[in-house]
Amino acid sequence: MSPNVDDGERLHRRSFVFDLHIHGPGFVPQPFRSVWRGLTVGAPAEVGFDALRKGGVDAAVAKAVGDPIVTRWYLGRSPWDAVEAQLARIERQASDAGALVVGSVDGLAEARAQGTPAIVLGVEGADAIGRDVDHVDAWHERGVRVIVLVHLRDNVLGTTCLPWQRYVGPLPVRRHAAAGLRPLGLRVVERMTRLGILVDVAHADRATLLAVVDAATAPVVSSHTGARALQDFPRYLADDELRAIASTGGVVGLWPYRYRHAGVRHITELIAHARHIADTIGPEHLAVGTDMNGVPGVMAGFGDETDLPKLTAALLDGGFSDREVNGILGANALRVLRKVEEHAHRRPHR
């Protein structure tokens, strides 16, 4: 056993552990959820938010999915209403697990002081906004504090790095527009920044990501990704993309994804990604995004949040200091949310 296992456990319990990207169980409605689970038999079993407490996780961003890969299965509902149904479900699940839904950094601190896991609401795939930028305000009023602009298909805001067909296999994909951030996407980014909603470019292609960063006046994140220098997987980021996100003061989340031949096979490979990213942009720009309940597969030895203490020990084994690991586990992400909040408060609201 690694000598850092006990040290990792102690450090994990002392740290503010913040997962930037999870989903609530059952976000795909039945009977379609059973079909999805049948197609992804290697995926870990879905778990409830009680796994956060068991895994020593203080907070997580739980995201509804706003693109048609999920919303189309909410039969008889508009994409907007499908997202609302998911957000309401997350709130019920949080309540059932004894977690608090919060909308500010102060709320995160209050939840931790009470010894209660905190849930921050998010949306992955802003397709449901349609062409109405004021929908961003409605989501903010609803409590949403993180939005992933694009998900598994291009939308009216920008373009994705990996359409859903490419996860399934070499299927044809019709791209309807040139890659990059659309004018409407720019307006959405500006509105999010003004309101204090964190911009998440996970799933964005290179052109969209760089355009978002170019327009950014507050930190930008990619909540679940890896280093493309280590594997040529479209969901991973090239070094200049990593540097672009770091230039905003943002973070990139370590992602335990493994499906078919893509992603990390085991925790040693995940630490290699952490090491490369830290060497490229500094450990202060690293975070964690497990994608709990949202991935078709994960690395060996990892099932859900209860396995996160293994990551803490492995980071120590990988040469990261206690302070650096504390940052990766959550302090860096907390810093980003605080800066996004402060930036919004400094801006005059029209």
Model feature map: region roles:
Residues 219-225:
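Short hydrophobic/aromatic-enriched beta-strand-loop microsegments
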Residues 16, 195, 218-219, 286:
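The start of beta-strands in P-loop NTPase/AAA+ ATPase cores
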Residues 1-174, 228, 232-288, 292-350:
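N-terminal hydrophobic targeting/anchoring segments and the immediately downstream early-domain regions
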Residues 199, 215, 245-247:
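Short gly/pro-enriched beta-turn/loop segments at secondary-structure junctions
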Residues 172-213:
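Loop-centered beta-sheet repeat module
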Residues 215-218, 343:
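A short linear boundary/processing microfeature
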